[in-house]
């Protein structure tokens, strides 16, 4: 059996080169505030992979994505070990575009903090009198640059995203920037409408895109997971304050309340976190993991 070593390790994912494809493994690591925490959250990697699979299948008619298979029987023997089952995805190789494509349908988090100070979110002027967690009249696209591990992503305007892409892909900056914006909003609208019918509000999320060998824009990375999105329960939703959530917000809140924790979570916080992830998966897909 040929052993594989990751060619790239992110905060949560490991990527392996499989010749003409990649194998992306979502680990049980958890990060918050750009730091990898000391604890592992059992089953988290499986939730991320299976949820991405669900959304990739759901949106394939809108645009192509990089997923080839989540069945380890389709992968080299090395990946048929227990630690890779359920949390591994074989993907097409893409040239990734250097923009995090963030879309916000509701005003919350850093967007809410910015709006209170300036009336704007990432330079976009919003109507007066919005409340925290309120639905925006239309989803807004607020791209950022991709930072290396340890650095913070930097919010940029749509116009700046044209320049960033033009530098790397001369002659294509405007074309790619426009496609990223339009795909991001179209994907969000389609999926947010579906999620609402299943009792979940998708407040915001981020997508990443790449180019295939023919220069087509293809959806990559992960899709609409509790790691990349804010999911709120529809039941009990009311603007005017922060909302309970199915995502990492629980972990962030605990860390903020316990600044001396040294990024070491107690077991009950870990248990509640995975329970939230599993609940979101079951509500959205109608399946149990």
Give residue spans per PLM region.
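Active-site loop/lid in soluble adenylation, ligation, and acyl-transfer enzymes
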Residues: 1-148, 261-289
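Coil-to-beta-strand transition motifs
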Residues: 21, 96-98, 198-202, 214-217
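Intrinsically disordered, low-complexity acidic/polar segments
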Residues: 33, 112-113, 214, 228-230
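Conserved metal-phosphate-binding beta-hairpin within the catalytic cores
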Residues: 103, 202-223
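A long amphipathic alpha-helix within ATP-dependent nucleotide-binding catalytic cores
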Residues: 169-203
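Anionic ligand-binding catalytic core segments
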Residues: 117-118, 126-175, 219, 223-284
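Generic recognition of stable, solvent-exposed alpha-helical segments in well-folded globular domains
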Residues: 46, 50, 175, 179-186, ...
